[in-house]
A protein has these predicted regions:
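Short hydrophobic alpha-helical segments of the AMP-binding
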Residues: 231, 235
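Short secondary-structure boundary segments
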Residues: 218, 245, 267
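Acidic/glycine-rich phosphate/pyrophosphate-binding loops and surrounding catalytic core
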Residues: 1-209, 213, 225-230, 240-242, ...
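Active-site loop ensemble at the mouth of alpha/beta enzyme cores that anchors a bound cofactor
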Residues: 278-282
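Short, structured secondary-structure boundary patches
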Residues: 217, 236-237, 241
């Protein structure tokens, strides 16, 4: 498993989350003595793929270094309902102040990882890989991209800066698939270039370009199979094929069995269902 995002990014998003919750202080936690010690346990209330340890830890590092966290599972691990995920020891005030912020990160990122894992499991036995998209929660892209990796998926481009994805409006503005890919290669010779196509005719045109990957946008299953056949018969540069658009769990297996290399699914980061975790004092 790669390291979770960038340490600076983790510190920044956690700091913002604490600030929006805490502001001038935790009025309720002040009811408890300043030096009252506590032991707390975080329990999963449903099966999940765990993700978010670094953000959870950073919350308490910023609030109070005296709070220690002992983990019983790693990011990417499958956890069962009622499993104890971690144990905290330290001042009760600080644990209570950080509880909601820390759990928010753990619940959201585990939700993304769990959703990804459920889709990855559907395509087991095929060579198709599941990709995320840029449809992420604002300010949390690197965190969610990491969660996708924890769930067994792959990252598409991180942003507009690290790869070129030529879509329909770009093609219309430039004039053609061929012209758009050629312009992209001249501009960025060492960057991955992907081009979106909406028909088999556009796919034929794209196969003759220097694109690295071709996105099949809203293709029917029959056209996907035809597209894979066209790619496999092509004697030039071998481009990977990515299916995109209107993909869900019910349609995913059939799409993977057409032979496409990737399926990109925005819902895994856009439609996040948080995993239910609770924290209880021992």
């Amino acid at each position: 498993m790669p390291p979770p995002a960038l340490p600076a990014d983790i510190a920044t998003v956690v700091s913002r989350a604490i600030a929006e919750d805490l502001r001038d202080g935790d009025l309720t936690a002040e009811l408890i003595g300043r030096y009252t010690p506590a032991v707390a346990r975080v329990v999963a209330r449903e099966p999940a793929t765990l993700c978010g340890r670094a953000w959870f830890d950073e919350t308490f590092r910023q609030l109070d270094h005296r709070v220690s966290v002992s983990w019983h599972a790693a990011d990417g691990d499958a956890i069962a309902a009622d499993a104890i995920v971690c144990e905290l020891r330290g001042p009760a005030r600080s644990i209570l102040t950080g509880e909601r912020t820390a759990l928010n990160f753990l619940q959201m990122l585990s939700g993304t990882a769990t959703a990804t894992r459920s889709l990855v499991d559907i395509v087991v036995g095929t060579h198709t890989r599941i990709l995320d998209t840029r449809k992420t929660l604002p300010g949390l892209r690197l965190a969610q991209k990491y969660a996708v990796l924890c769930g067994g998926g792959d990252n598409h481009r991180i942003g507009l800066f690290d790869a070129i994805l030529i879509k329909e409006n770009h093609i219309v503005a430039v004039g053609s698939v061929t012209a758009a890919v050629a312009a992209a290669r001249r501009q960025s010779p060492n960057v991955m270039i992907e081009v979106e196509v909406e028909s088999l005719d556009e796919l034929r045109e794209a196969l003759a370009t220097d694109a690295d990957r071709i996105m099949l946008d809203d293709f029917s299953l029959a056209d996907m199979r035809g597209g894979v056949d066209l790619r496999n018969a092509h004697t030039g540069k071998r481009q990977s094929l990515e299916a995109s658009g209107s993909v869900n769990a019910a349609s995913l297996r059939a799409i993977a069995e057409t032979g496409v290399d990737y399926v990109s699914i925005g819902a895994i980061t856009k439609h996040v269902r948080a995993i239910d975790f609770s924290m209880r004092f021992a």
